[in-house]
Structure formats: structure tokens, C-alpha cells
């Protein structure tokens, strides 16, 4: 009985070992590919628990979601002979589930070492060998990751369809310490130069602003002066027009006064012409003689009151009296003008 119990226990232990070796679990986002006697089977299994023949069949889990492969400490020689090292390069890739069996058959389950790691080393060395340290470290560093991604994807499209590269991230390479210090000094000088240039631009901008401000002020002063000049010109023109109007009015008044005086004199002369009859002239003669207070001596004094029409022609006497009357009239007419002058 003891022997039977030992056999049963041994068989139970063997069955437990066989079950433990045959049952396996596949995580989500992975596929299991199986090898039987070293040959790859064409039927992979998805996530979950699965059973296989122990000791005869083996499996490998292959990730089919996004994964990041890291390549560290990649050496690279520039065209100038300087050896630099890229500390870390990250490649984000994804394998399509339908292409898992073909890629594993052609490149094993560690396909990333063949298709990604080796290709990164090759492409990076190709890039460095045709560029200087200045270009690799500074000028062209921003395009290295894109160039690597493009070159990788181009080769994978031919060699392993179904494996896609999503992104490539490259860290700054390590360069010799002496060269690094020189670059740091150079960058510091560039920074100082940039600050100087920017300061100069600011000063030039301020000077340009001041110049424009001065031009604007000068233009404003010129415009104000022009407006004031135009205002003065208009004032002078207005004064000139007012003076012309006043002169015209004065001339019109003087002309009207002269016309009135001329008309008055003409009418007075016409009235005198009508008034100077022989009888009136005779009366004026006697009045003038009577009003004369001067004393005359001579033999002809009595004859002054005698009608001398017989001895003198009537025409001559009439002319003398008319001239005398005209002189008296002119004296009377000149008296108002003299008073106006005062």
C-alpha cells in the first residue's frame, strides 16, 4: 500500500509539473508565437490562458502595441575625425498583428535588434561621416531625428512590411571636454553679440523714433506758421478791401459834394443872369455909391448922380455894372467857403 501511495503521489506531481509547463498566460497587447521542435507554427494566440505540449512546444510573446526601443551609447565619427557619442536614441514603433508571424520567421522574435538597432547605428554613422562636428552638434542637429525616422521607415517598407516607426528621439551627443568648453565659450560670445546687436537695434529704433518725432514737430510748427501767414495775408487783404471801399465812398462823397457845389454855382449864375436887368443894375449902382463912405475930390463928383447915358454908350455902362455885380456876387459866395474852412 505504501508503494502504491508513493506511485500515485509521483504521478500527481508529474501531472502537476506537466500542467504547469503546458499552461501559459499572454498579456493584453501581445501575441504568442509557438515553436514545435524548432519549427515556427503559423497559428499565434492572443491574450489569455493557453495550453501547449510541454517540453515539445515553446512560445515567445511579441508586443503588438506601441513600444519604445532604446539604443544607448552610439559612437559616431564626424568628417573632421572627431569621435562623439549619442547617449540615448529612442525609437517608437508598432508591429501590426497580422505581420507578426512573417517578421518573426524572417528576423526572429528579437526582430528589433536586426531591423532597428543595427539600422540606427548604420544611418547615424553615415550621417556623421559626411558632416562636420559643427553641423552635427549645432547646425543640423534638429533634423537628425527626422532623417533617421525617414531612413528607417523606407527600409522597413521593403524588408518588414507591418512594422511602422512612429517617432525617433535623439539626445545631444557627447563631445570631448575641450571642444565642449570651446563651444560653450562660443555660445557665450554669440549670446553677448546677440545682446549687443539687439541693444544697438533698440538704440537705433529709439533714435529713429526721436527723428520721426522731431520731423512731426517741425511739420506741425511749419503748418502753424503757414496758417498764421495765411491769416495775416487774409487780414491784409481784408484791410485793403476795406480801404478801397472807404476810398470809393470818400470819392463818391467828394464827387457828390463837388457836383452839388457845381450845380449850386450854375444855378446861382443862371439866377444872376436872369436878375441882372438894366433897371436892377442901375439900382445896384446907386446903392453902391450911397454905401461908399470914402470922400472923393474933383470936378466930376456932381456928375456921379447924373444920368450919363447920353455921353456913354449903353452897352459899356451895362458891361461895367454887370462886372461890378458879378464881383459882389463872388464875394458873397466866397464868404461861406471861408467859414467852412475855419
UniProtKB/Swiss-Prot annotation:
Ranges that cross the membrane: 7-23
Keyword Transcription: no
Cellular localization per UniProt: Endoplasmic reticulum membrane
Entry keyword set: Cholesterol metabolism, Endoplasmic reticulum, Glycoprotein, Lipid metabolism, Lipid-binding, Membrane, Signal-anchor, Steroid metabolism, Sterol metabolism, Transmembrane, Transmembrane helix
SMART domains the record matches: PHB
GO cellular component: endoplasmic reticulum membrane
Glycosylation sites noted in the Swiss-Prot or TrEMBL record: 106
GO biological process: cholesterol metabolic process; SREBP signaling pathway
Topology Lumenal: residue spans: 24-342
All ranges on the Cytoplasmic side of the membrane: 1-6
Gene Ontology MF annotations: cholesterol binding; ubiquitin protein ligase binding
Domain of life: Eukaryota
Annotated membrane topology: Single-pass type II membrane protein
Region (Disordered): 308-342
Function: Mediates the endoplasmic reticulum-associated degradation (ERAD) of inositol 1,4,5-trisphosphate receptors (IP3Rs). Involved in regulation of cellular cholesterol homeostasis by regulation the SREBP signaling pathway. Binds cholesterol and may promote ER retention of the SCAP-SREBF complex.
Family label: Belongs to the band 7/mec-2 family.
PANTHER family linked: ERLIN (ER LIPID RAFT ASSOCIATED PROTEIN) HOMOLOG, ERLIN-1
Name recorded for this polypeptide: Erlin-1
